[in-house]
Amino acid sequence: GIASTAHYKSGMFNLGATRGNGQVGENVTTNMLTINSLPKILTSPIDVEVRGEVYMKKSVLDELNEERKNDGLPLLANPRNAAGGSLRQLDPNITKQRKLDQFAYTLVNPEKYNVKTQMDALDYLKTLGFNVNPNHVHCNDIEEVIETIEKYDSLRKTLDYATDGIVIKVNEFDLYDTIGYTVKVPKWAIAYKFPAEVVTTRLNDIIFTIGRTGKIIPNA
């Protein structure tokens, strides 16, 4: 999917943006309004920023590609690229047709809402009306972390969204400053990537074309 942020004023959705470079992203407010799983009015009239991920279900990608194949259009490569391209469309009607979804992950400035842990934040986001990924687990030790990784590595093919790993976070927010940050990322979170899927393909032919500058380019 594509990282996104949603801003609410008095409980009303008023700004949506992509993560961009971490400081400045694209304003995609109009397009995010087309995402049914993103609440437009919260259950509480608060000012809040919530970060998450906009994604396309694998079943939706298959459905869209079947339609595009019948219409003689190029197929969408994968759910991740399809979600990013769909969210950035200039025409929000096209975005709506792509049937995007959103998972909420992060409550910005949780102390303002008396939320003290990651698990409590996810529960709070659900009460506000957000779509929270049900596949999150509270682990008590490293053995449970390893068990969870192995479980979802074996289950990921059955999920209706593409995933290449798991994010592991310290649960207690008051430990974050103590644990600290590197120049680019926090030390209290780490992304574990599943082993890459390996497939075998047959190369039937190579066609050489000459580019504008005279460079010879091989095409499989």
Regions found by a protein language model. Give the residues of each.
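RNA/tRNA-interacting regions in translation and RNA-turnover enzymes
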Residues: 1-220
